[in-house]
Amino acid sequence: MTQTRIVPVILSGGSGTRLWPVSRESFPKQLWALVSDRTMIQETALRANGPAFAAPIVVCNQEHRFLIAEQLRNAGIVGARIVLEPVGRNSAPAIAAAAVLVAEEDPDAVLWMMAADAAIADVPALLTALDSAVVAARHGRIVTFGMRPTAPETGYGYIEQGPELAEAPGVHAVARFREKPDAAAAASFVADGRHLWNSGMFVFTARTLMEELDAHAPDVLPAVRLSVAERTADLDFIRLGVEAFSACPSISLDYAVAERTHRAAVVPADIGWSDVGSWSALWELGAKDAAGNVTLGDVVLESAENCYVRTDGQLTAVVGLKDTVLVVTEDAVLAMHRDMAQDVKKIVDRLKAAGRPEATAHKRVHRP
């Protein structure tokens, strides 16, 4: 049966350690409402919910399966297939499993791969860009979304765009992928107008992805095919074969395929995208008062400027601080300069090394 509708594939395997102490492995950031009154995974699923889309496939680890199923139901998402990874193997095996499942029905179906935890301000612009990406995907391209940079960000990878594709107006060949740059290189990328932030969203047909995995990462697909063949049904969940999936290399789709294939393309998009990868990113996204402060919860400020203050319970008062992040949870407090937001992971690593339960779990266990 030919699948004319786009199949959303939502990857929900991250732990979001840079948003500790709110995001932890047991309840990561995609399960929290951080930028709206819906959780991140609900917002992601709702962007791809309508007549143009098939029911989503969500790939996650088994510990989160009931929480994700409940959140999707509460958002009105019907018929989602939730695929359980027995172990984390990064994005290439995860999306390959979804592609193999879809290819059983229609190898030429178009898949839209996206992370569960990104924020997008302009959904209509996103869907317009998606239309262009689908045209290129149906011509055998692996299409990513490139975000026009608004600042010389060193925390993102960049894509250098090449010429526009004749068969897909608005979509460009990829000249090259670039690793996260230093500050000087990032500034030059922004200035030249040819470079885009790599969003990590991709559009391709199941057939194209599997062909490119075979060509560029031949260890991935055989193990994934076997794990899908050995799958079992568990309530509404799909459990992949443990031994076969565990044999997959741990590799991202960028490294496995996107940076190696000659079929890579990019659609430039101005959609207000953020990977919400740090507390400073949440400050940038948040509604600010006249002094540039973002507050959530029971917060009182005096002479504070450009701060992000969040409390999940107790009254939190801040006096005279600038450019500070203060996050208060039931069992942990994080205080830091906003410019150090990428270093939160170092704290989590130290807590793990010390055997502290706060590194990975909340004091209160969340049950659906």
Go through the PLM ranges and name each one.
Residues 1-10, 17-28, 33-125, 131, ...:
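Conserved N-terminal catalytic core of the sugar/cofactor nucleotidyltransferase
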Residues 2-5, 208-368:
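Left-handed beta-helix
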Residues 4-6, 53-54, 77-79, 106-109, ...:
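Short coil/turn connectors at secondary-structure junctions
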Residues 13, 61-62, 86, 114-116, ...:
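Fold-independent oxyanion-binding glycine-rich loops
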Residues 18, 30, 43, 47, ...:
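Alpha-helical scaffold segments in soluble metabolic enzymes
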Residues 88-93, 151-153, 183-185, 273-274:
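A short acidic, often aromatic-flanked loop/helix-cap motif at beta-alpha or helix-coil junctions
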Residues 111, 194, 201-202, 274, ...:
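A residue-level structural signature of the nucleotidyltransferase/glycosyltransferase Rossmann-like core
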Residues 123-247, 265:
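Conserved core of the sugar-phosphate nucleotidyltransferase
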